[in-house]
Amino acid sequence: MQKDFIIDEWQIYQAKAYGADCILLISEILSDREIKQFIGIAASLDMDVLLEFHQVTELSKILNSNLNIIGINNRNLSTLETTPFHALEIRDMFINEFIDHDIVAESGISSTLIIDKYLSNGITKFLIGESLLRESF
């Protein structure tokens, strides 16, 4: 997956050229038009799209995207503050809207206790990066 701040279509072509089969789109930095355009480009390249959001104000963009896989970022990109169960709280607030979606909890997943809480509440997909990089094996 190309996990980047994608703001231009050339980045999608570049991701495909480098072997990515999925791209991450961040709703807070893209317009509805850009989201639709980038989803279309990804589909034409046989790539999946993970569309993420943090703020509830972005919900209409998410639901209008017609994607089945939705990421809820536990990190507020404006403040960089991380709330480990934000994704669970948002999913629960809008459970009916997300009934047909696979939810990916993103960021702030730093322990098996956090993962266990998500699993026991039906969220089984995670995007984990920083905590793996900081872990010593």
Model-assigned labels for residue ranges:
Residues 1-8, 21-32, 46-57, 70-81, ...:
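Catalytic beta/alpha-barrel core
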Residues 7-19, 54-66, 96, 100-128:
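Catalytic cores of alpha/beta
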Residues 12, 35, 39, 59, ...:
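Generic structural signal for well-ordered alpha-helices
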Residues 14-34, 71-80, 109, 121-137:
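Glycine-rich phosphate-binding active-site loops on the catalytic face of alpha/beta enzymes
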Residues 18-19, 41-43, 67-70, 88-89, ...:
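Short, hinge-like loop/turn segments at secondary-structure boundaries
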Residues 63-92:
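Glycine/Thr-rich beta-alpha phosphate-binding loop at enzyme active sites
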Residues 84-94, 119, 132-137:
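C-terminal helical cap(s) of enzyme catalytic domains, especially alpha/beta-barrels
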